[in-house]
Amino acid sequence: MLKRSAILCASLLVMLPGALLAAPITTLPQHAPFVSTLPVRHTLPPFFDQLEKRTFDFFWDTTNPANGLAPDHYPGPSFSSIAAVGFALTAYPIGVERGWVTRQQAAQRVLTTLKFFEDAPQGKAASGETGYKGFYYHFLNMRTGKRWPGIELSSIDTALFMAGVLFDQSYFDRDTAQEREIRAIAGKLYNRVDWPWMQPHPPLIGMGWTPEDGFIPHSYRGYDEAMILYIEALGSPTHPIHKDAWAAWSASYPKFWGNYYGREQLSYGPLFTAQYSQSWIDFRGIQDAFMRAHHSDYFINSRRATESQRDYAIANPMGWTGYGKDLWGLTACDGPGNFAFKADGKQRQFYGYAARGAGIVGTLDDGTIAPTAALGSIAFAPKIVIPMIEAMQARYGKSIYGRYGYVDAFNPSFHDRNVALNSGTVVPGVGWVDSERLGIDQGPILLMLENYRSGFVWRVMRRNPSIRRGLERAGFTSGWLDGKPATQ
């Protein structure tokens, strides 16, 4: 089975393998109210406090406390996603700073996770392994942590996991036995990733490998979510890739660059490509060669991509129900399923899980809205995200918002109740509403809410020497890399 990220880049559909009953979950008791000591950058309406807490609770409550593995999706039976583990490892310190868990509780959860991955078996065998060459399989059994059958060793998902590992390495900086061990194991996990091995077509980084078939015949190139992959690989103190890799990866940028809804930008379509790397790395004011030549930076670029998606929804060229300034946001997410029938008076094609988006390179839009698309961009474009979320909550909140925040997606144009849905249900007067929440979509909501409110995740990651080394080897200069304050 191809990895989800490779399928997303090709805008194909993902058919997940059979489900696994999730491990028993232990929910820790609620704690006394706490006033955050985080510096206030921007205030938000009270609803967003609740949303951030509920999204944190998703990671704290659904992760297997015995090994730290976070589910790919919940509440349905699920395997673990290593990318979701990376977001979870970042979520725990946010919980500390917001007073939702103690530092010791978070440190223990992190240490449990890191120890599991430190000791998990690595090898070439097709079963019974968690990873190989320092990389990890995209999906793991929630209980055993072993490879989910048929799944690939994933470069990008390993990188998203490692983003959480490096974040914890920098956050847990106290001189205690527990925090020293966190830093030591985090360094060990990162240092043993053999990044050059994952380059069957150097200097590009390949998408993945399986014991059965070897390397996937595609590499990451061009503007997408793989920025963080290349930066981590360039920054490795033990197995770095050649510095020419960034230039090779970005060589195809010209085909992604252009004017989309009145804004010059690198445009890929699904908003997750603009959000994943920037959930951790502060790109405000720092520039590589391409951005220097175009008098921009990746933060500004993501703002323009977000604003263009809103304008696309206002234009609503396909005539989907509800689209406009108060409802927009296309990204990779769940969908009702693969169906073709009449809706809104037109012949329509709907999809299951797919890389929805609108941009220069193409559009895939079936009327499905993912709350993570807008919320993951709140730090880029708060003036349009905040009122959109408030309007969406007022109109659809009773159906799409719950104990762990927003469901993954919903579709106001889909009302057929006589088909076998991939997940979720059709709610009268609302449309299709997913029943699942995905870790890789909950993560950007939590991290970017906190980055907008306090800059916390960005500030911690700016201290990580491997991230700085990777950025500098990629040719980034200016901004906080030169000691200047990061401004929005």
Go through each PLM region and give its residues.
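N-terminal leader/targeting segments
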Residues: 3-4, 17, 24
